[in-house]
UniProtKB/Swiss-Prot annotation:
InterPro entries: RuBisCO_ssu, RuBisCO_ssu_dom, RuBisCO_ssu_sf. Its main location: plastid. Heterohexadecamer of 8 large and 8 small subunits. GO terms for molecular function: ribulose-bisphosphate carboxylase activity. This is Ribulose bisphosphate carboxylase small subunit.
C-alpha cells in the first residue's frame, strides 16, 4: 500500500530532476529546507528523524540535493521527505512537504475494529512494518 503523505503524494514518484526543480522553487522563495526520514509510516507519526541540520539561508538547491543524496545512501529503505519552512512573521510554519524516497516494499496497514458500548465502533490503524523492530522494518 503506497503511503500518501505530502504535497505530491498521489502522483508518481518524483525524479531527481523534478525534485531539483521543487528545491529551486523553495530556495527562490527564501524558504528554509530540511530533510527527514522514518521507518514508521503511520499517518499520525509527525515526528520523523531530522537528517543533519535544517538548511537555513541556502542560496543553491544543490546543497539540499546533496543532503537528500547523503540520506538516501545511509537510509536506502526508509521514507525520506523534504520540508520547506516559512519563517515569515505570522506564518512560521511548514508550507511544503514531499516524499523523495520510499522503501522498495510498502507492506501497508491493518485496520483494527473494536466494539464498544451502545454498538459503537472504534477504528485504529496499525502498520505492518512496525511489527519488526526499529531499524529493521524494511
Amino acid at each position: 500500500m503506497r503511503l500518501t503523505q505530502g504535497t505530491f503524494s498521489f502522483l508518481p514518484d518524483l525524479t531527481d530532476e523534478q525534485i531539483s526543480k521543487q528545491l529551486t522553487y523553495i530556495v527562490s522563495k527564501g524558504l528554509s529546507a530540511n530533510v527527514e526520514y522514518t521507518d514508521d509510516p503511520h499517518p499520525r507519526n509527525s515526528y520523523w528523524e531530522l537528517w543533519g541540520l535544517p538548511l537555513f539561508d541556502v542560496k543553491d538547491a544543490s546543497a539540499v540535493m546533496y543532503e537528500i543524496s547523503s540520506c538516501r545512501k545511509a537510509k536506502p529503505n526508509y521514507y525520506i521527505k523534504v520540508n520547506a519552512f516559512d519563517n515569515t512573521r505570522g506564518i512560521e510554519s511548514c508550507v511544503m512537504s514531499f516524499i523523495v524516497n520510499r522503501p522498495i516494499n510498502e507492506p501497508g496497514f491493518l485496520l483494527q475494529r473494536q466494539d464498544f458500548e451502545g454498538r459503537t465502533m472504534k477504528y485504529s490503524l496499525h502498520s505492518y512494518a512496525t511489527e519488526k523492530p526499529e531499524g529493521a522494518r524494511y
